[in-house]
Curated annotation (Swiss-Prot):
Changing residue 100 to H: In HPE3; sporadic; in the mouse sequence does not affect signaling activity in any of Shh signaling assays and causes no apparent defects in cholesterol-mediated autoprocessing reactions. Keywords: Autocatalytic cleavage, Calcium, Cell membrane, Developmental protein, Disease variant, Endoplasmic reticulum, Glycoprotein, Golgi apparatus, Holoprosencephaly, Hydrolase, Lipoprotein, Membrane, Metal-binding, Microphthalmia, Palmitate, Protease, Secreted, Signal, Transferase, Zinc. Changing residue 24 to S/A: Abolishes palmitoylation. A lipid is attached at residue 197 (Cholesterol glycine ester). Glycans are attached at residue 278. Its EC number is 3.1.-.-. The gene is SHH. Ca(2+) 2 binds at residues 90, 126, 129, 131. The record marks 267 as: Involved in auto-cleavage. This is Sonic hedgehog protein.
């Protein structure tokens, strides 16, 4: 039965993508034929991203020098790619040693160089440094940085070489010298800690039958507080976890508001709804205008990556007003980072939205288009409903037919789908859901690289 369901889902996903490809979509890279990108060479002394190398937005902090006798030496792997020339002036093979992430990016760059300039190869002049020839806390000491040129040493090519390094996925690229380009990557554990789109296990949701529940304890049949596309509160079925890692230690963005005082933790690539500038700070989102939080339209609230939310912007929180519960915009007071070891969980509801710690968030991550992500999961929701209909004897544990709409604010209650526990992926299996992995893979084929958050999904190095 599950195999059949997966086959049906694949067919539906393909149909959905074909249809969307014929349309002119609202997002970057959507609904249009991808043309070869025009690459612009970096200028001398330019670096991308435009932040310091050892900051969160680039390659991250220095984690300590690696020597041949240290425990961390096993983190380094030799690169024997025949398409790369290693200078290795020390004759120790040190320049070939690097982290797996650095190796993957370097190998990708080698292919780009050969495609850009036939007959020319990538040349590495400096890799891992064990002799202390670089500045203090240089990432060369960790095997996370390389200095590169082209094999013909044609300096007129170096600006474009730097651009190719950016496109290959290096986390920081610097046209450092007229003689070479400097590239570096994040630490392996740093990438894993910051990747994905999740909430910590300590986050809470509101249940239809009253009370709250830790997000890590959600199970099929639970109905949790969410919002529709007009910003009205309702209860929606919890379907599955798109990602679940009980033992994860993650870096979360901490979004805090003061009036009312709320605190939400979520990973960098997760989507959070932000109110437009003309949305009254004291009023409810107007249903008549279609400007409710989940719409993501140009004039209404939009969903942003958590890493892009800034103090002064306004998010939607649940507040009591005139004895009624409703969504109100609240100004973000601070955005900080916190490392938590409470696990990481990405719940999916039928509505595609969820109230976490009384703050409205999307169920989706990786791509900054909530509406498109929700459409992409339509086949999954359909399969879930079909399988539920095939097992009418089973009922949801979270259902309470007499509960009505306890969310207030004129909200609507979604119908409970019996047999939800039998839906594909409804169990609490650890790891990333197979459907999410499928969509991510398709997205990497169809979308521009800028459309996907760089920390959207932790991908194992090959």
């Amino acid at each position: 039965m599950l195999l059949l369901a997966r086959c049906l889902l694949l067919v539906l996903v393909s149909s959905l993508l074909v249809c969307s490809g014929l349309a002119c979509g609202p997002g970057r890279g959507f609904g249009k034929r991808r043309h070869p990108k025009k690459l612009t060479p970096l200028a001398y002394k330019q670096f991308i991203p435009n932040v310091a190398e050892k900051t969160l937005g680039a390659s991250g902090r220095y984690e300590g020098k690696i020597s041949r006798n240290s425990e961390r030496f096993k983190e380094l792997t030799p690169n024997y790619n025949p398409d790369i020339i290693f200078k290795d002036e020390e004759n120790t093979g040190a320049d070939r040693l690097m982290t797996q992430r650095c190796k993957d990016k370097l190998n990708a760059l080698a292919i780009s160089v050969m495609n850009q300039w036939p007959g020319v190869k990538l040349r590495v002049t400096e890799g891992w440094d064990e002799d202390g020839h670089h500045s203090e806390e240089s990432l060369h000491y960790e095997g996370r940085a390389v200095d590169i040129t082209t094999s013909d040493r044609d300096r007129s090519k170096y600006g474009m070489l730097a651009r190719l390094a950016v496109e290959a996925g290096f986390d920081w690229v610097y046209y450092e010298s007229k003689a070479h380009i400097h590239c570096s990557v994040k630490a392996e554990n740093s990438v894993a800690a910051k990747s994905g789109g999740c909430f910590p296990g300590s986050a809470t949701v509101h249940l239809e039958q009253g009370g709250t529940k830790l997000v890590k304890d959600l199970s099929p049949g639970d109905r949790v507080l969410a919002a529709d596309d007009q910003g009205r509160l309702l209860y929606s079925d919890f379907l599955t976890f798109l990602d679940r890692d009980d033992g994860a230690k993650k870096v979360f963005y901490v979004i805090e508001t003061r009036e009312p005082r709320e605190r939400l933790l979520l990973t960098a690539a997760h989507l959070l709804f932000v109110a437009p500038h003309n949305d009254s700070a004291t009023g409810e989102p107007e249903a008549s205008s279609g400007s409710g939080p989940p719409s993501g339209g140009a004039l209404g609230p939009r969903a942003l990556f958590a890493s892009r939310v800034r103090p002064g912007q306004r998010v939607y929180v649940v507040a009591e007003r005139d004895g009624d519960r409703r969504l109100l915009p609240a100004a973000v007071h601070s955005v900080t980072l916190s490392e938590e070891a409470a696990g990481a969980y990405a719940p999916l509801t039928a509505q595609g939205t969820i109230l976490i710690n009384r703050v409205l968030a999307s169920c989706y991550a990786v791509i900054e288009e909530h509406s498109w992500a929700h459409r992409a999961f339509a086949p999954f929701r359909l399969a879930h409903a079909l399988l539920a209909a095939l097992a009418p004897a089973r009922t949801d544990r979270g259902g309470d037919s007499g509960g009505g709409d306890r969310g207030g604010g004129g909200g609507r209650v979604a119908l409970t789908a019996p047999g939800a526990a039998d839906a594909p992926g409804a169990g609490a299996t650890a790891g990333i859901h197979w459907y999410s992995q499928l969509l991510y893979q398709i997205g990497t084929w169809l979308l521009d690289s800028e459309a996907l958050h760089p920390l959207g999904m932790a991908v194992k190095s090959s």
